[in-house]
């Protein structure tokens, strides 16, 4: 996904990066930005199996930033230390330790098959270009971001299924 996004033209204040690694390292990466270049918005894209959406469904929302209880935060940190790489875990850890900007846009795609590799499942392949367009819009258009629903982890209802946005 990051490779496809890197092929696009971006304004100078947008950074495209693959952050699919340890949540503690992601937090440290975000904190590495000098104060004058700290991010004001993060747009995070991930394939996440929620089980309540058809494969290829796209969900976009502004994360409300609400963290789970202390026990769940501790579990997320422990999982991060042991190498768990998952969207919710990364968001909880990076928010808890103050690495995320206030404005976080989440774009989730329900995978057809969730496994490591360079190829997308057929349902995801059908929507990947539209997902890339959505990422560009969310990274560059504050008005479009403002129109997204605000939601907790797991987000709102899908905005697209199959090969078209609804």
For the regions a protein language model found, what residue spans apply to each?
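N-terminal catalytic or cofactor-binding beta/alpha core of small enzyme domains
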Residues: 1-99, 106-109, 118-129, 138-166
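Short "lid" loop at the C-terminus of a central beta-strand within the Rossmann-like core
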Residues: 112
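Hydrophobic "lid"/C-terminal helical patch
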Residues: 135
């Amino acid at each position: 996904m990051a490779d496809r996004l890197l092929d696009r033209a971006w304004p100078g204040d947008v950074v495209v990066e693959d952050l699919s690694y340890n949540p503690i390292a992601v937090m440290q990466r975000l904190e590495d930005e000098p104060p004058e270049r700290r991010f004001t918005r993060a747009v995070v894209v991930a394939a996440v199996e929620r089980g309540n959406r058809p494969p290829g469904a796209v969900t976009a929302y502004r994360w409300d930033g609400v963290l789970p209880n202390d026990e769940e935060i501790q579990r997320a940190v422990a999982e991060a230390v042991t190498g768990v790489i998952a969207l919710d875990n990364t968001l909880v850890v990076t928010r808890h330790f103050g690495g995320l900007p206030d404005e976080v846009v989440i774009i989730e795609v329900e995978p057809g098959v969730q496994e490591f590799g360079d190829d997308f499942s057929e349902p995801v392949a059908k929507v990947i270009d539209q997902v890339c367009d959505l990422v560009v819009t969310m990274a560059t258009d504050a008005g479009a971001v403002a129109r997204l629903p605000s939601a907790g982890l797991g987000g709102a209802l899908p905005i697209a299924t199959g090969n078209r946005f609804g």
